[in-house]
UniProtKB/Swiss-Prot annotation:
Further remark: Ortholog of the human HERV-FRD_6p24.1 envelope protein. The genome contains a high percentage of proviral-like elements, also called endogenous retroviruses (ERVs) that are the genomic traces of ancient infections of the germline by exogenous retroviruses. Although most of these elements are defective, some have conserved a functional envelope (env) gene, most probably diverted by the host for its benefit.
Pfam families per the UniProt record, alphabetical: TLV_coat
Organism: Pan troglodytes
Record topological domains on the Extracellular side: 16-478
Record PTM: Specific enzymatic cleavages in vivo yield the mature SU and TM proteins.
Name of the molecule in the record: Syncytin-2
Localization terms from the record: Virion
Motif CX6CC, residue numbers: 431-439
Functional description taken from the UniProt entry: This endogenous retroviral envelope protein has retained its original fusogenic properties and participates in trophoblast fusion and the formation of a syncytium during placenta morphogenesis. The interaction with MFSD2A is apparently important for this process. Endogenous envelope proteins may have kept, lost or modified their original function during evolution but this one can still make pseudotypes with MLV, HIV-1 or SIV-1 virions and confer infectivity. Retroviral envelope proteins mediate receptor recognition and membrane fusion during early infection. The surface protein mediates receptor recognition, while the transmembrane protein anchors the envelope heterodimer to the viral membrane through one transmembrane domain. The other hydrophobic domain, called fusion peptide, mediates fusion of the viral membrane with the target cell membrane.
UniProt gene name: ERVFRD-1
Quaternary assembly: The surface and transmembrane proteins form a heterodimer. They are attached by non-covalent interactions or by a labile interchain disulfide bond.
Length: 538
């Protein structure tokens, strides 16, 4: 298959190797140990350097859809026709923002994190959004989805936003709703969903509507003892164990399904009010995007992997985990494989059978049909996927700081081009002359350099270890070039020390026996009897 190895580790005991520069390999090593795998010791652990297939995606189980937490990111813009109403509109805006649960002002990371990722197995749940002018994030084929929910927007349907601060209550669009294939939901209902989620408090009607509906069982994802339930009012999923009481695991404040449906809305939330004028007056528009708060979980959309879905997204997505392509080979195999593409070494012609890490752990790719519990495979995917998320966060932090540095520099350059302080001293300086806010240089180059230096040090350490370590085959051959001439004398001396005393004893006995025989033969020739020879003083 022409596998090119990026990192190669060989040790008599893999459990003895621990290094912070290899978090993914460390995690793989720990998983092999915890599962009692026969490959937990004395094996080669390899990662692929192929950029075409950086890893493999695995879908989350139905129960994980009810436990993985999402978060919302909000931005807004005022209506261009809004005049003379900024003060009351600002008051309304602050109240509405407080009523949204778990809102994050930190800019999310948009765009695919990985591409050309293949999904292994069948996703239990997929969410499809169809927007004419939406941002396409990728589309999963229907053949890999067990149940597909389609999101419909209600941008033209309004309802009252109840708040005690207003005499005439503002009106907002209704939240988006979802449709599902015929036969997906059974008539069986449960009151298990009522009163949930309870991990946060909010007055926002999109999350805590006044009219609670009973949840309906999703037949394709449920078993006799474990039900996966859908609350169509709040667009939320719940997992109920029928053998236990009602007091079970707490539901996240913002569920994955709720966050995905909200982010599909065109312009998020459009606020209109009656009490500012005689007719409905547009005030401001919300843009809401969603991200997965649970570390290690990603949105899988087609062959693209996302950490966040933008506002007004379109496509077909599921959630799951991403694992790197890590392979195992038994330690008794000779693998003279060049590291980092060293072309000076001879190429190995024979094929080597590599074992995927998950196969070494005794895990097979599961499907999304009828599995409500969290499986051993899901936990493994989650642990490996968390290490990838940590690496992404490190790179994102460095890039974000660099962007802040560029923004700060751009502000100073634009300001300096408008004038010089010495030319506008009579007017109080350039800021007063231009009637603008004063911009100052915010030097964050130290943070940028520290973040980049950390990444470069990790890469440099790995590269140095690959080129100077004892596993470097080129260096090994140079080492043998001066050791080989000394091998012959050293081996000869060792053999002489081991077998020399034995050989000397044998030679002494042989010489002594030959001398006795010669002496006996001489006496017989002289006519003496052996007895006389023995009694003779001579």
């Amino acid at each position: 298959m022409g596998l090119l190895l990026l990192v190669l580790i060989l040790t008599p005991s893999l459990a003895a190797y621990r290094h912070p520069d290899f978090p993914l390999l460390e995690k793989a090593q720990q998983l092999l140990q915890s599962t009692g795998s026969p490959y937990s010791t004395n094996c080669w652990l390899c990662t692929s350097s192929s950029t075409e297939t950086p890893g493999t995606a695995y879908p989350a189980s139905p129960r994980e859809w009810t436990s993985i937490e999402a978060e919302l990111h909000i931005s807004y813009r005022w209506d261009p026709n809004l005049k003379g109403l900024m003060r009351p509109a600002n008051s309304l805006l602050s109240m509405v923002k407080q009523d949204f649960p778990d809102i994050r002002q930190k800019p999310p990371i948009f765009g695919p994190i990985f591409t050309n990722i293949n999904l292994m197995g069948i996703a239990p749940i997929c969410v499809m959004a169809k927007r004419k002018n939406g941002t396409n994030v990728g589309t999963l084929p229907s053949t890999v989805c067990n149940v597909t929910f389609t999101v419909d927007s209600n941008q033209q349907t309004y309802q009252t936003y109840t708040h005690n601060q207003f005499r005439h209550q503002p009106r907002f669009p209704k939240p988006p709703n979802i449709t599902f294939p015929q036969g997906t939901l059974l008539d069986k209902s449960s009151r298990f969903c009522q009163g949930r989620p309870s991990s946060c408090s909010t007055r926002n009607f999109w999350f805590r509507p006044a009219d609670y509906n009973q949840c309906l069982q999703i037949s394709n994802l449920s078993s006799t003892a474990e039900w996966v339930l859908l609350d169509q009012t709040r667009n939320s999923l719940f997992w109920e164990n029928k053998t236990k009481g009602a007091n079970q695991s707490q539901t996240p404040c913002v569920q994955v399904l709720a966050g995905m449906t909200i982010a599909t809305s065109y312009l998020g939330i459009s606020a209109v009010s009656e009490f500012f004028g005689t007719s409905l007056t547009p005030l401001f528009h919300f843009h809401i995007s969603t991200c997965l708060k649970t570390q290690g979980a990603f949105y899988i959309c087609g062959q693209s992997i996302h950490q966040c879905l933008p506002s007004n997204w379109t496509g077909t997505c599921t959630i799951g985990y991403v694992t790197p392509d890590i392979f195992i080979a038994p330690g008794n195999l000779s693998l003279p494989i060049p590291i980092y593409g060293n072309s000076q070494l001879p190429r190995v012609r024979r094929a080597i059978h590599f074992i995927p890490l998950l196969a070494g752990l005794g895990i097979l790719a599961g499907t999304g049909t009828g599995i409500a519990g969290i499986t051993k495979a899901s936990l493994t995917y989650s642990q490996l996927s968390k290490e990838i998320a940590n690496n992404i966060d490190t790179m994102a932090k460095a890039l974000t700081t660099m962007q802040e540095q560029i923004d700060s520099l751009a502000a100073v350059v634009l300001q300096n081009r408008r004038g010089l302080d010495m030319l506008t001293a009579a007017q109080g300086g350039i800021c007063l002359a231009l009637d603008e806010k004063c911009c100052f240089w915010v030097n964050q180059s130290g943070k940028v350099q520290d973040n980049i230096r950390q990444l470069l040090n990790q890469a440099s350490s790995l590269r140095e270890r690959a080129t100077q370590g004892w596993l470097n085959w080129e260096g090994t051959w140079k080492w043998f070039s001066w050791v080989l001439p000394l091998t012959g004398p050293l081996v000869s001396l060792l053999l002489l020390l081991l077998f020399g005393p034995c050989l000397l004893n044998l030679i002494t006995q042989f010489v002594s026996s030959r001398l006795q025989a010669i002496k006996l033969q001489t006496n017989l020739s002289a006519g003496r009897h052996p007895r006389n020879i023995q009694e003779s003083p001579f």
